[in-house]
């Protein structure tokens, strides 16, 4: 049943009223779907986005940075679209799209050569976009390992000139360094470039690309700022480790200082005196909070402000002494939970107003700047995750780059078109142009921004437990009793609601997008009939790198949000081994297991954030272990293959299942289910099922149509049967009476959905779950985490789970203890993809060849657009690929 969307009037009213008349009850349960309604966006992270000012949408963009020319007449941005976008800040109109110059030459070449040989793989790095002081040059840090140089003509048109290579690095998976922040000398003759992987700063002759000097700085330098004869460099990971430092992996084999949870513990600002000749050491290093990033210099050059996105703090440095003289918070109140994530700074022309982009709050904080007495004046609503700022003094406009703009859904008007749907790869960043507000206007904007964040719920989330409360499925306050003693939290891989449950007539599904319906997934269909069907639940992330972070920590850090620029340091979702382990990626507020352990709860992890390998127990056997070998070993009970897992986050080591397979699509999920059921029996014998069990069940990702792997339908059927077997085992165990099972996808990127790119399948299974119910309340991954926290007596970790809607509507009391019985699969689990040469259909044969080349050994390394086309054709036959999703792809 396909339902049209509507937005409750109360939600839109939040944007037009003050907070004084709002209480937490006004935010209780939203039933609207995620997506755009007019100029507003309902996000899958509990927030409403209603940006102030004029908006310029950048389809496919994710703009990472802004550069404003000295005369204020040109604004430039860049993101993941392999180009510059030049804009007139006065009108908000695009002036020019500029290709990035070739990276093949290190010397200046005629502009025409650079244009004809444009670098179509280059894209904006984490940071680094600067005009020369005279406005005739523009420099862009390219994530692939060079600096792109552009000329700017008198008529304000750009031309790509040449690229400046930076020295290589010798890392396990990368030889190109990663340029980030850029500063340009006052005379334009030198540029200063931070190298994010080698932890260095380069001084480069602008005309020739010659490296003049090199300095060591801190870990993962991001921004560079020139102040007189000194250079300031912000370092995401703080000081370089020394002997005795407690360290953890920080991507690409690098290390950073960490805390007891293996999460990055500090940031820093390196100070370099340019007048010190050839000395390569920094002059000083100022330690601030983790994820040090944005820098801004007051117009008089006296005060440097540095933002720590990992602590929500801003530090004011006196450039005469290089001492911190003030630290203040970007949050509305200092006692608020983590979650502002200040990621960009800008001063007004007089230096009396400081603007700060609070990425996680979709707002620009406005401060009255007075060192030692800085005061928050209010918040201006921006787009989704503002990450760059510029203040245009002539028109008094605040220019904001919004990383996620107004969401992935750029074609909402086509909702009723046949076969219409959304996919998370429909990126859409934006720029906002906001007139400097008056005092009264700022007050109204502040009320809007806080209402958009459901801010009153932060206070409610911190209320103490009340005495003498009877146990309920989901307590209203952390610490109040729950009927549940155990939670099992299962993460699956990459499916949308419509792909699996689009054929369920009682829910809001589109059967034309359902390629793994009841024939393939009979257990999931039986579960939603016997328990509850959730048809308005969403993943919070786009893909595995941010998806697993949202699913486990209820937030994605600034580091992860910027990482979409090529994932140059790591792909931090687990399953990658050393090169995916990255303490800089993780939330300073920790993961759900950190929360549980800190409050005395027992935890066990079956695969999440672990990396595994398999080998023959008999070392003389040299046969390659394929799916066929694993299936034979499992189905035949041979037990000749050993599986071992290592934690990707060191603090998980005592709590992981070591005889385990995490991400390995050659290992069937029914193997994982069987191993878990063995462990469950041991738990029963010892009566010690952990309070929190985390489980990664990944095979619904599929291997495409790769020969030697099961067909897509077989792998999804395998995942379905394993899920059903786990539920069956738990529901027939002694723990059933006080156990709740949650299951959700990590992200929905490998599919299509007619409601939202983020909508997914979710399951709430327990004796207290409402039976035979359709739940239309809007939930997301943070809702699941908030509900888990309330069940286990845990406080929220950050502002996102604190303001999430608990899943009260999914439960009832008294309970129904009827157990679940799994049903057998309809699709053989070992139904294999044929060899390409045996496929008669030319397109399907091409798909098989393409699948063979997809890098499926680790999560999300293949082109998802190609894989989605392959899955569609493999499962939907001759039905045309959805028109909304068509784009030119190279299926070869």
Question: What is each stretch, according to the model?
Answer:
Residues 5-6, 23, 625-626:
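Intrinsically disordered low-complexity regions specifically enriched for long asparagine
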């Amino acid at each position: 049943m396909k339902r049209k969307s509507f937005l409750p009037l109360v939600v839109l009213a939040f944007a037009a009223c003050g907070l004084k008349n709002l209480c937490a009850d006004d935010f209780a349960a939203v039933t609207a779907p995620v997506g755009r309604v007019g100029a507003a966006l309902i996000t899958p992270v509990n927030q409403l986005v209603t940006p102030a000012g004029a908006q310029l949408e950048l389809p496919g963009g994710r703009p990472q940075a802004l550069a404003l020319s000295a005369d204020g007449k040109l604004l430039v941005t860049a993101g993941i679209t392999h180009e510059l976008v030049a804009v007139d800040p006065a009108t908000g109109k695009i002036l020019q799209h500029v290709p990035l110059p070739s990276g093949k030459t290190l010397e200046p070449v005629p502009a025409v050569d650079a244009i004809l040989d444009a670098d179509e793989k280059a894209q904006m790095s984490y940071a680094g976009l600067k005009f020369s002081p005279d406005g005739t040059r523009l420099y862009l840090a390219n994530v692939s390992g060079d600096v792109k140089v552009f000329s700017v003509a008198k008529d304000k048109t750009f031309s790509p000139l040449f690229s400046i290579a930076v020295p290589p690095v010798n890392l396990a998976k990368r030889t190109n360094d990663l340029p980030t922040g850029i500063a340009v000398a006052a005379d334009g003759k030198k540029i200063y470039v931070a190298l994010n992987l080698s932890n260095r700063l380069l001084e480069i002759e602008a005309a020739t690309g010659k490296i003049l000097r090199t300095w060591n700085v801190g870990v993962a330098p991001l921004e560079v700022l020139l102040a007189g004869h000194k250079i300031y460099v912000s370092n995401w990971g703080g000081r370089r480790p020394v002997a005795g430092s407690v360290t953890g992996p920080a991507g690409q084999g690098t290390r950073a200082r960490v805390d007891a949870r293996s999460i990055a513990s500090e940031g820093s600002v390196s100070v370099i005196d340019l007048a010190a000749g050839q000395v390569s050491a920094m002059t000083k290093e100022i330690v601030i909070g983790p994820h040090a990033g944005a820098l801004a210099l007051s117009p008089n050059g006296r005060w440097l402000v540095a933002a720590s996105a990992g602590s929500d703090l801003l530090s004011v440095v006196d450039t005469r002494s290089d001492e911190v003289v003030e630290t203040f918070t970007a949050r509305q109140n200092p006692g608020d939970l983590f979650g502002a994530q200040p990621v960009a700074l800008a001063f007004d022309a007089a230096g009396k107003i400081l603007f700060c982009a609070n990425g996680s709050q979709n707002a620009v904080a406005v401060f009255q700047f007075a060192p030692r007495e800085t005061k928050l004046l209010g918040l201006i609503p921006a787009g989704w995750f503002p990450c760059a700022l510029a203040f245009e003094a002539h028109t008094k406009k605040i220019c904001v780059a919004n990383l996620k703009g107004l969401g992935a859904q750029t074609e909402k008007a086509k909702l009723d078109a046949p076969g219409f749907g959304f996919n998370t790869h429909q990126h859409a960043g934006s720029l906002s142009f906001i007139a400097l507000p008056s005092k009264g206007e700022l007050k109204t904007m502040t009320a809007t921004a806080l209402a958009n964040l459901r801010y009153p719920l932060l206070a409610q989330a911190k209320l103490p437990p009340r005495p003498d409360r009877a146990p309920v499925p989901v307590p209203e306050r952390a610490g109040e009793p729950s009927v549940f003693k155990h939670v099992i939290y299962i993460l699956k891989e990459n499916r949308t609601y419509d792909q699996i449950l689009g054929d369920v007539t009682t829910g809001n599904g589109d059967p034309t997008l359902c390629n793994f319906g009841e024939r393939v997934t009979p257990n999931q269909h039986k579960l939603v009939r016997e328990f509850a069907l959730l048809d308005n639940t969403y993943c919070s992330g786009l893909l595995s790198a941010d998806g697993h972070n949202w699913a486990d920590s209820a937030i994605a850090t600034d580091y992860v949000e910027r990482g979409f620029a090529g994932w140059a340091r790591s792909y931090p979702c687990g399953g990658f081994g050393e090169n995916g382990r990255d303490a800089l990626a993780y939330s300073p507020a920790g993961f759900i297991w950190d929360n549980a352990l800190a409050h005395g709860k027992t935890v066990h992890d079956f695969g999440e954030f672990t990396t595994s390998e398999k080998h023959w127990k008999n070392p003389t056997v040299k046969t390659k272990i394929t799916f066929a070998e694993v299936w034979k070993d499992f189905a035949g009970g041979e037990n000749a293959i050993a599986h071992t897992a290592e934690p990707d986050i060191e603090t998980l080591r005592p709590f992981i299942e070591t005889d385990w397979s995490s991400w390995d699509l050659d290992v069937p999920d029914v193997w994982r289910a069987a191993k878990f059921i063995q462990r469950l029996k041991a738990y029963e014998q010892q009566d010690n099922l952990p309070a929190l069990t985390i489980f990664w069940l990944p095979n619904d990702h599929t291997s495409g149509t790769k020969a030697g792997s099961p067909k897509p339908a077989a792998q999804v059927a395998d995942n379905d049967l394993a899920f059903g077997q786990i539920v069956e085992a738990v529901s027939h165990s002694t723990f059933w009476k006080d156990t709740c099972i949650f299951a959700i996808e990590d992200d929905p990127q490998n599919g299509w959905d007619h409601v939202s790119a983020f909508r997914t399948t979710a399951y709430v299974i327990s004796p207290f779950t409402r039976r035979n119910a359709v739940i239309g309340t809007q939930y997301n991954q943070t809702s699941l985490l908030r509900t888990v926290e309330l069940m286990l007596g845990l406080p929220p970790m950050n502002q996102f789970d604190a303001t999430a809607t608990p899943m009260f509507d999914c439960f009832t009391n008294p309970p129904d203890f009827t157990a679940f019985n799994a049903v057998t699969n309809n699709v053989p689990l070992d139904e294999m993809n044929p060899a390409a040469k045996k496929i008669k259909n030319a397109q399907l044969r091409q798909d098989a060849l393409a699948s063979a080349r997809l890098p499926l050994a680790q999560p999300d390394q293949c082109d998802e657009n190609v894989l989605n086309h392959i899955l569609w054709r493999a499962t939907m036959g001759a039905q045309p690929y959805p028109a909304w999703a068509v784009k030119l792809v190279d299926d070869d």
